[in-house]
Amino acid sequence: MDIDEQIIQDYSNSKLDVVQIDGLVVLKIIKQCKEYLPELVPGQLLGLDIGTSLEVSNCFPFPPRDQEDENSESIADYQLEMMRFLREVNIDSNTVGWYTPTYLNSFFNESVIETQYNYQATINQKCVVIVYDPIKTSQGTLSLKCYRLTQSFMELFKDQSFSRERLDQANLSFNDIFEQIPIKIHNSQLINALLYEFDGASNNLTNSFDRLNISNNIYLEKVVEGMTDCLESLNQELNKVYINQRNIQTQKTNYIQQKFLEGQKVDEDELASMIKPLNPPSKLTSLLLTNQINNYTDQIHSFSGNSLTKLSLLKDLQK
């Protein structure tokens, strides 16, 4: 039994209800992502696996691409060295996943899928990926989401089988690639007391009308642009499928015409054997594009809902 088969069999025992992240880790992720912008540099998550929860207590960024090339040091060696340093100072060094910054939550791609699969297949089925969106966070709402691959998708990815028949057999749609895990931000009692004081001081502010600002046209435009790009890419994938089907049909037509000219009957078994096997395009790209389009529509829906709420409040204030 190889490691992939063992991972799939044990997946049902890896129930994960919540991911608890220290507030300091959230601040470190935001700070590290801001320092490396516009480059999107991912990083490692460290913590503990406790029952049906995952506790994230520390993190560190991976080396940027240019530094990695200059030092000729692989990311794996860098991770091992960092975790060795953390163990020396008695800090949790257990890998529980990784984080990655993204623009407009556009992280549904094959690179992320492959990285997350390797984490779950080789380290722990409960390993997660935390996605941070600096653009959406700049709009006033912390955008931090946690995902891991589903069991059904892990099975398909292990076999690299994403044909139409295999997807139908597994009953897998674009919604079945990732499962989202709830995030709980945890702070110490001292930090909670400090935040309580800050919250009390902010309540003394007399003017909070700036929160009703709805001039986020740039954000909405970027989301629509991203959706348009995904739709164009999806159309290209559909064209590949159409060309593949047309080539198969051309082979069948040529065979039937040849038999007709020879005055012979068409043998279905012979026809099936005469058709040259064509490699159909993988449906993985189409699944990821569809998932990303669905993600963009959710963002537009959320943006529209918040804007309508603000408009309603402004209307009441004008009365």
UniProtKB/Swiss-Prot annotation:
Gene3D superfamilies: Cytidine Deaminase, domain 2. InterPro entries: eIF3h, eIF3h_C, JAMM/MPN+_dom, JAMM_MPN+_peptidase_M67A, MPN. SMART domains: JAB_MPN (SM00232). Residues 19-153 form the MPN domain. It is found in: Cytoplasm. PROSITE patterns: MPN. GO terms for cellular component: eukaryotic 43S preinitiation complex; eukaryotic 48S preinitiation complex; eukaryotic translation initiation factor 3 complex. GO terms for molecular function: metallopeptidase activity; translation initiation factor activity. Component of the eukaryotic translation initiation factor 3 (eIF-3) complex, which is involved in protein synthesis of a specialized repertoire of mRNAs and, together with other initiation factors, stimulates binding of mRNA and methionyl-tRNAi to the 40S ribosome. The eIF-3 complex specifically targets and initiates translation of a subset of mRNAs involved in cell proliferation. Component of the eukaryotic translation initiation factor 3 (eIF-3) complex. This is Eukaryotic translation initiation factor 3 subunit H. It comes from Dictyostelium discoideum.
